[in-house]
Amino acid sequence: MSADTRFESLKAIVPAVSRETANRLIAFEDLFRKWSKAINLASPSTLNELWTRHILDSAQLFPLASDAKHWLDIGSGGGFPGIVTACFLAEQPGGAIDLIESAGKKAAFLRTAAGHLHVPARVHSTRIEAMWEKIETPQVVTARALASLNDLFGLTELWLTNGAKALFQKGRDYQREIDESRVGWSFDLVQHQSAIDQASVILEITNLRRKVA
């Protein structure tokens, strides 16, 4: 796939995207492939569709909160959606994202990617719980392929109950996860259909509260 084809496919997801952001994402794809030869950053079966399955899939989050300047991505793994979001934030004055990743090798990759791409990403190589009191409430919290919705609420409760919006990417079992989480939590939900996978959704969650037994 040529750079122009990649740019056009990105514009279909984020119409206002600049060529500079597209070039950053293309550079990230190249860096990701190089590091993937040494460490497991993503399922090998998806590397042939890296641009679509991971980069475009992550890019679709940004238009849902494009005015937000402080983002937080938990369980950042290989940088989806955290580094992808950082590429968009690089053109937003004052924009920044915190990435939390406990695996040392993946955190090292994230730091390398942030430096190589010159994007405003701060990488924290620790457990999510260790950052509860250290990261001020962001405007947006993201997570992709990390945990059940119920567990995500437990991990992000401090931020989501203090005004942060969640954008959680979920697969085909999302409705079961929503139903199970409503047993112990109340929240406002807007469900966005994924532009990449018709069986997947983005759950936009606000006003999270733990139910009192």
Swiss-Prot record:
<keyword id="KW-0949">S-adenosyl-L-methionine</keyword>
<keyword id="KW-0808">Transferase</keyword>
<keyword id="KW-0963">Cytoplasm</keyword>
<dbReference type="GO" id="GO:0070043">
    <property type="term" value="F:rRNA (guanine-N7-)-methyltransferase activity"/>
</dbReference>
<dbReference type="Pfam" id="PF02527">
    <property type="entry name" value="GidB"/>
</dbReference>
<dbReference type="GO" id="GO:0005829">
    <property type="term" value="C:cytosol"/>
</dbReference>
<dbReference type="InterPro" id="IPR003682">
    <property type="entry name" value="rRNA_ssu_MeTfrase_G"/>
</dbReference>
<dbReference type="InterPro" id="IPR029063">
    <property type="entry name" value="SAM-dependent_MTases_sf"/>
</dbReference>
<keyword id="KW-0698">rRNA processing</keyword>
<protein>
    <recommendedName>
        <fullName>Ribosomal RNA small subunit methyltransferase G</fullName>
        <ecNumber>2.1.1.170</ecNumber>
    </recommendedName>
</protein>
<comment type="function">
    <text>Specifically methylates the N7 position of guanine in position 527 of 16S rRNA.</text>
</comment>
<comment type="similarity">
    <text>Belongs to the methyltransferase superfamily. RNA methyltransferase RsmG family.</text>
</comment>
<keyword id="KW-0489">Methyltransferase</keyword>
<feature type="binding site">
    <location>
        <position position="144"/>
    </location>
    <ligand>
        <name>S-adenosyl-L-methionine</name>
    </ligand>
</feature>
<feature type="binding site">
    <location>
        <position position="80"/>
    </location>
    <ligand>
        <name>S-adenosyl-L-methionine</name>
    </ligand>
</feature>
<feature type="binding site">
    <location>
        <begin position="128"/>
        <end position="129"/>
    </location>
    <ligand>
        <name>S-adenosyl-L-methionine</name>
    </ligand>
</feature>
<feature type="binding site">
    <location>
        <position position="75"/>
    </location>
    <ligand>
        <name>S-adenosyl-L-methionine</name>
    </ligand>
</feature>
